[in-house]
Structures are given as structure tokens and as C-alpha cells.
Curated annotation (Swiss-Prot):
Ligand for members of the frizzled family of seven transmembrane receptors. Acts in the canonical Wnt signaling pathway by promoting beta-catenin-dependent transcriptional activation. Plays an essential role in the development of the embryonic brain and central nervous system (CNS). Has a role in osteoblast function, bone development and bone homeostasis. This is Protein Wnt-1. GO terms for molecular function: cytokine activity; frizzled binding. Belongs to the Wnt family. GO terms for cellular component: extracellular space.
Length: 369
């Protein structure tokens, strides 16, 4: 009996260990494609020959087979992906510049750190903004002629209104959304709560870019009378996308894993997200969702990869999140002065140069203890 008990116990431990490893790999694989931001050169004049390996840079080894195939099928698109990811990183840092979590990044493969291993609000924003970055950049690159497989969106043609008509070069948001969905979502594996959360937030980012598209027009007529206008659809600024997603971050929905039961007859997907609080309405496609409480980000935590707020500059006169009381988590702050030299009293001289003086000012800084 004892040998049999030992074997059963050993088998149980092996299954648990394998399950834990699988979950860890699933978490880490979700954002592996972010590593393309470290690509030294974003040119991707890649052959379509099966015998030639699609790895011109070590960072591309982080991509799945499907993602590498998509890059090979769309020459020029790797530069667009890289640019979109760069924009997403900058926007994330700007939106959270005054928060305890200020969207820190690293130079390694996992550029956003260990926080993405948690199902919290911050992870939701990271997935949404990076997905939006790819869609936005690819759609813009199509209209600029930077990608061989797409062009402007010319579907809108002919009369549009009483004094205007469709024309010009609309940004190709449809190609950006389709490519973004195939490229970004292909890194998600499984059918668990984290999978549903990441897929939902990825789509929320793409939907935000689409919903914020604006109509632009150019006037035609004698002396600028604007008797007739030619109009096209233009992408929003990425700052507008970031502002929208930041609002969704503040109002994010906490969700649980919902399962209506199997339905073999209709083959309908029964797994879905439900609000943790049954009195709340289900999240909309543009809402951000999370399932785990965020760390407080006040002190260093190696498990979550948070560095704390010690040494951060705070605003002593603010009662908001950037104020010293909240940002420093009640630990207090130190005040110091520093001398800063800046260019000032600049004058333009015809033609063509600008002359400036150097002005030295004293700045007062408050840093969290």
C-alpha cells in the first residue's frame, strides 16, 4: 500500500507542478511580443521562403509563429508595430506620471515588469494601450504608404452631404483593427479568466481608436469661399486615445469568470466575463476589466516588481494624487533646492537664426521619504 500511496502522491505533485508551470508560461507569453520594442532596426524585408528563418534580430524570437508569419506577409509593418509600441509606452508614462504607479519600464524582454502577472487595473491599461498603439500606428502607416499590403481607405467615395463629398486619403482603421487583432491576440492562450481579461482589454484599446476617428475636410471655391468641401476620416491623436483609456482605467470593472454551461447543439461560446458585484451592469466592449486588487505601490516589492515611491517628486500644495500626502503614502517628504540653467529671452534674427540668453533659476523640489 505504501508504494502505491507514494506513487499516487508523486503523481499529484507532478500534476500540480505542471499546472503551475503552465499558468506561469501563459502569463509570461501574453506580452512577449512587447519585446519587439528592442529591435535594433525595424526594417523587415523578409523573404517568404520557408527555408529561410524569420529571425533577423534576437527580439523577434519572442514572437509566435503566427506573428512572424504576419510580419513576413506585410513588408514594412514591423516598423509600424515598433512605433506603435513606443507611442504606447510614452503615453502610459505620461498618463500615470503623477500616480504611485507611474508605468515604469525596463530594457529587458518583459518591458512592463512583473506587474503584468497580476490581473489588476494597471495590467488592464497596459494591454489596452499597447493594443491601441499597434492599431493606431498600422492604420496611419497604411495611409502614408509605409506598408506594402495596405493603402488609404478609399471606400468612402461620392456625395456625403449637401455641400461636401467624400475624397482624399482616409486612415485605414479597418486594416489596423484586423491586423491588430490577429497579431496582438494571437499571443493569448487558454480559456481562463486572465485570457478573457486580456482579450477584452486588447479589444477595448482597438475600439477606442476606432470610436475616436474624426472627419476632416478641405474647402474648395473662389477665394476660399468653401462652396464645396472634400472630406475624409482621420485618426485621433494618440493623446486623445490615452485620455479616453485613462478615464476607463479610473472606472474599470472588476469581473469574475462566468460560465452559462455547455451548449453543444449551438456551439455558442459560453465563457464570458461577469461583474463581481451582481448589481453592476456588465462591462461594455470599451470598458477596461480586471479581477485582482492592485498593490499599493508605496514600497518596494520584488514579487510584483514595484519600486515604491521613495525619491519621487511630489506637489506639496496639491490634495490630489500627485500631492505629497498621497504620493508619499504618509511617510513625509524632504525639500531641497537646485539651480537650473535654461535658455531665455530668445530673439529671432532675419535671416535666419535665433539667439538666446542663459538664465539660472532656483527650483524648490519636494521628494518622498
Amino acid at each position: 500500500m505504501r508504494p502505491m500511496t507514494f506513487i499516487v502522491g508523486l503523481k499529484t505533485l507532478w500534476i500540480l507542478a505542471f499546472s503551475s508551470l503552465s499558468n506561469t508560461l501563459a502569463v509570461n507569453n501574453s506580452g512577449r511580443w512587447w519585446g519587439v520594442v528592442n529591435v535594433v532596426t525595424s526594417t523587415n524585408l523578409l523573404t517568404d521562403t520557408k527555408n529561410v528563418q524569420l529571425v533577423l534580430d534576437p527580439s523577434l524570437q519572442l514572437l509566435s509563429r503566427k506573428q512572424r508569419k504576419l510580419i513576413r506577409q506585410n513588408p514594412g509593418i514591423l516598423h509600424s508595430i515598433n512605433s506603435g509600441l513606443q507611442s504606447a509606452m510614452k503615453e502610459c508614462k505620461w498618463q500615470f506620471r503623477s500616480r504611485r504607479w507611474n508605468c515604469p519600464t525596463t530594457g529587458g524582454d518583459n518591458i512592463f515588469g512583473k506587474i503584468v502577472n497580476k490581473g489588476c487595473r494597471e495590467t488592464a491599461f497596459i494591454f489596452a494601450i499597447t493594443s491601441a498603439g499597434v492599431t493606431h500606428s498600422v492604420a496611419r502607416s497604411c495611409s502614408e504608404g509605409s506598408i506594402e499590403s495596405c493603402t488609404c481607405d478609399y471606400r468612402r467615395r461620392g456625395p456625403g452631404g449637401t455641400d461636401w463629398h467624400w475624397g482624399g486619403c482616409s486612415d485605414n482603421i479597418d486594416f489596423g483593427r484586423v491586423f491588430g487583432r490577429e497579431f496582438v491576440d494571437s499571443s493569448e492562450r487558454g480559456r481562463d479568466l486572465r485570457y478573457l481579461m486580456n482579450r477584452h482589454n486588447n479589444e477595448a484599446g482597438r475600439m477606442t481608436v476606432f470610436s475616436e476617428m474624426k472627419q476632416e475636410c478641405k474647402c474648395h471655391g473662389m477665394s476660399g469661399s468653401c462652396a464645396v468641401r472634400t472630406c475624409w476620416m482621420r485618426l485621433p491623436t494618440f493623446r486623445a486615445v490615452g485620455d479616453f483609456l485613462k478615464d476607463r482605467f479610473d472606472g474599470a470593472s472588476r469581473v469574475i469568470y462566468g460560465n452559462k454551461g455547455s451548449n453543444r447543439a449551438s456551439r455558442v461560446q459560453t465563457h464570458h466575463l461577469e461583474p463581481e458585484n451582481p448589481t453592476h451592469k456588465p462591462p461594455s466592449p470599451q470598458d477596461l476589466v480586471y479581477f485582482e486588487k492592485s498593490p499599493n505601490f508605496c514600497t518596494y516589492n520584488g514579487k510584483t516588481g514595484t519600486s515604491g515611491t521613495s525619491g519621487r517628486v511630489c506637489n506639496s500644495s496639491s490634495l490630489g494624487l500627485d500631492g505629497c500626502e498621497l504620493l508619499c503614502c504618509g511617510r513625509g517628504y524632504r525639500t531641497k533646492t537646485q539651480r537650473v540653467t535654461e535658455r531665455c529671452h530668445c530673439t529671432f534674427h532675419w535671416c535666419c537664426h535665433v539667439s538666446c540668453l542663459n538664465c539660472t533659476n532656483t527650483q524648490v523640489l519636494h521628494e518622498c521619504l
